[in-house]
């Protein structure tokens, strides 16, 4: 899919829905929201109890009556209604009105036409705006300040929570790409397994993630 800078330049919001975290950026302001992609609901009436960081803190601690889920899997919607509820709340935090909003929403390069349409439908249901899909490697390159329209090829490796995408981009498009379901979440599980095997100690996902960030980051986070 060829990237359209003219459409992208007119967008109000940039939205990245990841398996682990959701980020929203505003034109001219940069990232204005970063929250976990987690939703907690009451299993009896399906009412949303908590979203984002509050919901993430409930993982492994919630009673049986509360279901804590990640509605995004591998960059693709796995629970439409919960994703709508989550994104609706997030968007309302960063804009006063949803009228006239145009958003650029990140989608995996390997996403099918059905998956892309589902992402657009979800965004429209959440805040009723025009949606411009942007392939994940292109969005990552733009975020790094690379000139995606130059004839010089760039290799982009984007490791998220549920998937890692590797792509070669040039002249505003993706020349070749590969997506693998081996990323940050799997790293966390490997850390949990190692600590249990090495020290016979059981740690949770939040602790494993913190270990990964503190030890595995090339730059302080």
Which sequence ranges carry the predicted segments?
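Nucleotide/phosphate-binding catalytic cleft detector across ATP-hydrolyzing
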Residues: 1-159, 167-221
């Amino acid at each position: 899919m060829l990237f359209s800078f003219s459409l992208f330049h007119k967008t109000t919001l940039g939205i990245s829905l990841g398996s682990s975290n959701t980020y929203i950026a505003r034109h001219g302001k940069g990232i204005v929201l970063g929250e976990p992609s987690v939703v907690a609901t009451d299993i009896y009436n399906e009412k949303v109890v908590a979203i984002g960081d509050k919901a993430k803190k409930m993982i492994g601690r919630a009673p049986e009556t509360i279901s804590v889920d990640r509605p995004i899997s591998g960059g693709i919607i796995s629970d439409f209604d919960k994703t709508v509820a989550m994104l609706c709340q997030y968007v309302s935090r960063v804009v006063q009105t949803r009228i006239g909003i145009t958003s650029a929403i990140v989608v995996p390069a390997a996403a099918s036409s059905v998956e892309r349409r589902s992402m657009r439908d979800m965004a429209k249901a959440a805040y009723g705006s025009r949606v411009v899909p942007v392939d994940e490697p292109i969005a990552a390159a733009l975020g790094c300040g690379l000139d995606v329209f130059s004839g010089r090829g760039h290799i982009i490796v984007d490791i998220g929570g549920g998937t890692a995408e590797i792509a070669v981009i040039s002249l505003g498009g993706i020349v070749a790409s590969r997506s693998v379901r081996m990323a940050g979440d799997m790293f966390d599980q490997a850390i949990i397994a190692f600590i249990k095997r090495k020290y016979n100690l059981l740690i949770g996902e939040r602790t494993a993630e913190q270990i990964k960030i503190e030890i595995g980051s090339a730059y302080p986070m």
